[in-house]
């Protein structure tokens, strides 16, 4: 895969950790890695490494590669979360990276962008699945961080599979008390899950940048939930009334309307 923007800028390409060029299709690119289509049924997440392509078509690794994430933290998290329903199936590590099952239906963000409003029951199923998968992460002492529509893939049966734990925090299983790390807390994970719930109900993507408690959005920074099903629950969550995903789930499950046919 070559990157070439202007004639005077050297061509660069993605490389594996052994220096060989990445020749497979790159499906996605995050801050720390590439997702490549490794086989019909698998993808491989590899460190984000580049090389300059020299005039004789040999390659020279970029010096910035020394700062690349080696994915060992994410590997430990996928190992901790193995078997958790709703997490992308982790198939182990190779010399190149992390092997995961391929989900050909794309992300919930793509689905929202490209499809009309789904039936009420489908959206409710997604909402409860999403809360459950991230609550299970918290129960396994994983502080997730990157909770977004783009990181929720759709399996063949349209159930959810969560990916991207590159920035997540792994805490000792025997540890008790609040999950928190450098100002980021489990409540901020609740905020980002709530933004996804709003997005699915309004069928319009909404997200905020919030990585510290003091960046929590105020009422002017979030959309109105008037006339939105479960709008009062979302408004309560945005005003920090739920400390855990379990609390949020209980309230949603108990106040879930049968559903406007297509709201």
Q: Model segments located where?
A:
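Protein kinase-like catalytic core scaffold
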Residues: 42, 86, 98, 161-164
